[in-house]
């Protein structure tokens, strides 16, 4: 009967930490004119993009303004370096738990460095003239970012769900009531019911596409030497799964980063290059085709980093397994490469479709409720909700099994 108590403790730890992380966003750092700062950042696309993941922390420069963002970026960089540096790749694959701990420690160090860089950039951007205020701001933001990282690790180990994902989920979903409030405040038109119904329909379509992307898989049958030796086991198929969207939200993140870089260059320079860049900015005809190209490109790049057909073929060979009607070796690699490329293209097109719906909703109804969420946010919300629900279901199954025993 210990399992139910353990589950209660997991849920309690998760809820308490999420509450503390949310409260920290609203504790302002002293020495800043927050009203003036909030008015300034409204036109800054990069800050608004980060503000979504900070749950509004950038609008007030609360102590948790950076939140989990430095840890997320550090984790992304480490994952990329693992694929590029053989030592780190060997550390992850061959060293087991010790290697995992070393990689986690590297991620923490990089998080600290990234938090220092981001906090210093914010302090300089605010134009703090006094050294003591600059130091106070950097120390507050960096320390709180490390606390947020610690919170996320506690949730992952002792709570329910993935810690970093839940913190981002909480920050994103907290912006929805404000968007809905802005919508209900402006419902003075005669077509409110029709517009609301159409927006609800768009929302359901987006939700369905998100679930298809998150849960979409390509099943590939695997036949092992053990199965060939036992006729009874031939009926029990071993399945190898390829996800429709291997890159997750990363194609969105990279594509958005490039677009915001273009926007930054356009706003801060004045040359012939700027005039050319302006053709690809939001609200321009070439923006969506360019964004589609970026999403497809980054989907292929990121998928190639996290999923290598050669490694899969080698592992199958080590296990004495193969794909039916496909010879081991080069034919298996070619077969997997073809399937992965097709899935990546389909997944990238689905991702682009998600980006279209909030934009279409905004231009048709002039309502930024969905547009404010963004495609990245919607994908994260659905993905985290599905993963957390699966973990909760697993805990409940274990509880039920123990009670039956």
UniProtKB/Swiss-Prot annotation:
GO biological process, one term: protein targeting
Annotated Pfam families: SecY
Key words of the record: Chloroplast, Membrane, Plastid, Protein transport, Thylakoid, Translocation, Transmembrane, Transmembrane helix, Transport
Organism: Antithamnion sp.
Subcellular location: Plastid, Chloroplast thylakoid membrane
Name listed for the protein in its UniProt record: Protein translocase subunit SecY
Segments crossing the lipid bilayer: 12-32, 61-81, 112-132, 149-169, 193-213, 247-267, 285-307, 345-365, 367-387
Keyword Protein transport belongs to the record: yes
Protein family according to the UniProt entry: Belongs to the SecY/SEC61-alpha family.
Disulfide bonds: none
HAMAP family in the record: SecY
Quaternary assembly: Component of the plastid Sec protein translocase complex, which is composed of at least SecY and SecE.
Topology of the protein relative to the lipid bilayer: Multi-pass membrane protein
Superkingdom classification of source: Eukaryota
């Amino acid at each position: 009967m210990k399992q139910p108590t353990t589950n209660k403790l997991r849920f309690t730890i998760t809820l308490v930490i999420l509450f503390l992380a949310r409260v920290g966003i609203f504790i302002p750092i002293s020495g800043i004119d927050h009203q003036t700062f909030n008015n300034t950042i409204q036109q800054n696309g990069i800050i608004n993009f980060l503000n979504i993941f900070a749950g509004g922390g950038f609008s007030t420069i609360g102590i948790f303004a950076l939140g989990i963002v430095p840890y997320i970026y550090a984790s992304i960089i480490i994952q990329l370096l693992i694929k590029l540096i053989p030592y780190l790749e060997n550390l992850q694959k061959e060293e087991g738990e010790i290697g995992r701990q070393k990689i986690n420690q590297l991620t923490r160090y990089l998080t600290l460095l990234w938090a220092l860089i981001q906090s210093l950039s914010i302090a300089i951007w605010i134009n703090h003239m006094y050294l003591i205020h600059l130091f106070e701001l950097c120390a507050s933001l960096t320390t709180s970012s490390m606390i947020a990282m610690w919170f996320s690790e506690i949730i992952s180990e002792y709570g329910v769900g993935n810690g970093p994902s839940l913190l981002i989920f909480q920050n994103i979903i907290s912006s929805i009531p404000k968007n809905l409030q802005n919508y209900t405040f402006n419902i003075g038109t005669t077509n409110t019911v029709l517009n609301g119904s159409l927006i609800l329909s768009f929302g359901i379509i987006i939700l369905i596409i998100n679930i298809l992307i998150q849960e979409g898989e390509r099943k590939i049958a695997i036949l092992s030497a053990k199965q060939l030796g036992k006729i009874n086991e031939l009926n029990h198929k071993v399945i190898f799964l390829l996800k429709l969207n291997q890159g997750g939200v990363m194609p969105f993140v990279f594509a958005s980063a490039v677009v915001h870089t273009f926007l930054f260059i356009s706003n801060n320079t004045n040359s012939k290059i700027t005039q050319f860049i302006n053709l690809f900015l939001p609200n321009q005809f070439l923006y969506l085709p360019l964004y589609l190209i970026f999403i497809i490109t980054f989907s292929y790049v990121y998928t190639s980093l996290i999923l290598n057909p050669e490694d899969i073929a080698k592992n199958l060979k080590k296990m004495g397994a193969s794909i039916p009607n496909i010879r081991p070796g080069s034919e298996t690699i070619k077969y997997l490469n073809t399937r992965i490329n097709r899935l990546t293209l389909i997944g990238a097109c689905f991702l682009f479709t998600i980006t279209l719906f909030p934009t279409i909703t905004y231009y048709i109804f002039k309502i930024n409720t969905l547009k404010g969420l963004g495609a990245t946010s919607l994908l994260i919300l659905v993905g985290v909700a599905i993963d957390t629900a699966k973990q909760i279901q697993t805990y409940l199954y274990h509880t039920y099994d123990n009670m039956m025993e």
